[in-house]
Swiss-Prot record:
Keyword Transferase annotated: no
Name recorded for this polypeptide: Glutamyl-tRNA(Gln) amidotransferase subunit A
Active site: residue positions: K80 (charge relay system), S155 (charge relay system), S179 (acyl-ester intermediate)
Organism: Leptospira interrogans serogroup Icterohaemorrhagiae serovar Lai (strain 56601)
EC number annotated for this UniProt entry: 6.3.5.7
PANTHER family: GLUTAMYL-TRNA(GLN) AMIDOTRANSFERASE SUBUNIT A, TRANSAMIDASE
Length: 487
């Protein structure tokens, strides 16, 4: 691996700003690393090498003239395949959109380009962001760089794997029920799901509009802080965007463990023993450093997954109705009949998991069942929000494992969707409540597979969230040894 890519994100940023390395050198190193390892990892669906090199050369020219767009000018960032980039295919890893080129930039893309970031599209994902393993892509299965026989998590598995394998220092994904945090956990990364409404969804292909949020990946906390500071902010093109003071890195609130009230949960027998061991080790260190641990009763959250899947699939059924082979999506016109065109285009264009969720969502919204399922789920969602409000009247943050297990083997759970859904047991409730949460590295199991710790704070308290993450990074056993050689 090129020596440049052995540098931390902060070192890379400092080297770009001091002139020790050029963007062209950094981008070339990323391209060579992708050539070297992505045949095995399969994080990227496509990369226009000429385009990214041209962008790097333009960045170097700006710096040479003393006119960099920002301190991030020339920094590579990978983009998930459901975030629109003008004149670039945005397929959502689905056959129905395999040739769709977006006519516009997503707001987050515009913000990145304004700061001079070098975009590396497109990373693989579960089709339309529906999955927890990136096995649901119509094109390829992404593998975990720590063990190529295992999944990287999902649905943003391509973005997570690209960062974990040192192909790029930063990446963007989307999180509907854990799709940034869970792959971050399984790939040893920092991954942020921001407060709902703080990052524009304009240009993000919608799965479940009331749950989706774009979030960053990085090996280092500072990478997530910097990306969030760039992509957050009010956007008039997104009606769910919230007007708040612009976040900056200076808003990070350093946290002292002494006096910090930390909400914790009880582990259950189905949780992998090494996950429990790592979690207990963190809690013991927190007690030693003066934190107050408060046991929280999460029994009411046992229904979070069914609530999530009723709401998410209902919104998915509505959002994906536009992909009919006429307005959007590839057309399969075999008989010349309009109804057959709809049926054939969607039958051939959507994969099994997407079809399953469309059917479930359509049923939940159907006459006679709407109140019993969707209406009841929304009422239960409100109760989850109130439960979190009650928790945060007692604690400053909640700590729990991000995932109940480390990365499982490819194909292990594909035939049992319920077991796959349970991988999101601790992440979905955060989306239902619209809260900010982050997965941070919490060491590894005996096989060297990463374990993640989820931090949750009240709405709009990303500054505190980052401060707690920074403090946690100083604890013993939190670091991850990333693989240089991937075979």
């Amino acid at each position: 691996m090129n020596e440049i890519l052995k540098k931390s994100y902060v070192e890379l940023k400092d080297s770009l700003n001091s002139g020790k390395i050029s963007s062209t050198e950094l981008v070339s190193a990323c391209i060579n690393r992708i050539r070297e390892v992505d045949g095995a990892v399969k994080a990227f669906l496509y990369l226009d090498e000429k385009k990214v090199l041209n962008s790097a050369e333009e960045s170097d020219k700006r710096r040479k003239e003393g006119k960099p767009l920002s301190e991030f000018d020339g920094m590579p960032v990978a983009i998930k395949d459901n975030i629109c980039i003008r004149d670039t295919i945005t397929s959502c890893s689905s056959k129905i959109l395999e040739n769709y080129k977006s006519p516009f930039h997503a707001t987050v893309v515009e913000k990145l380009l304004e700061k001079g970031f070098i975009l590396f599209p497109r990373t693989n994902m579960d089709e339309f962001a529906m999955g927890s393993s990136t096995e649901n892509s119509a094109f390829q299965t992404t593998r975990n760089p720590f063990d190529l026989e295992r999944i990287p998590g999902g649905s943003s598995g391509g973005s997570a794997a690209a960062v974990a394998a040192s192909m790029v220092p930063l990446a963007l994904g989307s999180d509907t029920g854990g799709s940034v945090r869970q792959p971050a956990s399984l790939c040893g990364l920092y991954g942020l799901k921001p407060t709902y409404g703080t990052v524009s969804r304009y240009g993000l292909v919608a799965y479940a509009s009331s749950l989706d949020q774009i979030g960053p990946f990085s090996r280092e906390l500072q990478g997530c802080i910097d990306l969030y500071s760039v992509i957050s902010g009010k956007d008039v093109r997104d009606s769910t965007s919230i007007h708040r003071p612009k976040f900056s890195a200076s808003d990070v609130q350093p946290q002292d463990f002494k006096g910090l009230k930390v909400g914790v949960i009880k582990m259950t027998p189905e949780i992998q023993s090494e996950v429990v061991k790592s979690y207990d080790k963190v809690l013991n260190q927190l007690k030693e450093k003066g934190a107050t641990l408060v046991d929280l009763d999460f029994s009411k959250f046992g229904f979070a997954i069914p609530i999530y899947y009723i709401i998410a699939t209902a919104e998915c059924s509505s959002n994906l109705s536009r992909f009919d082979g006429i307005r959007f999506g590839s057309r399969k016109d075999k008989t010349g009949k309009l109804e057959d065109l709809f049926v054939d285009s969607r039958t051939e264009g959507f994969g099994p998991e997407v079809k399953r969720r469309i059917l479930l969502g359509t049923f939940s919204l159907s006459a006679g069942y709407y109140d019993a399922y969707y209406g009841t789920a929304q009422k239960a969602r409100a109760l989850i929000r109130k439960e979190y409000e009650s928790f945060f009247s007692k604690v400053d943050c909640i700590l729990q494992p991000t995932s109940p297990t480390t990365a499982f083997k490819i194909g292990e759970k594909t035939k049992d969707p319920i077991q796959m859904y349970k991988a999101d047991i601790w992440t979905t409730s955060v989306n239902l409540a619209g809260l900010p949460a982050m997965s941070v590295p919490m060491g590894a199991d005996q096989k060297g597979l990463p374990i993640g710790l989820q931090i949750t704070t009240p709405h709009f308290q990303e500054g505190k969230l980052f401060g707690i993450a920074l403090a946690l990074s100083t604890l013993e056993g939190m670091n991850i040894q990333f693989p240089e050689s991937i075979k």
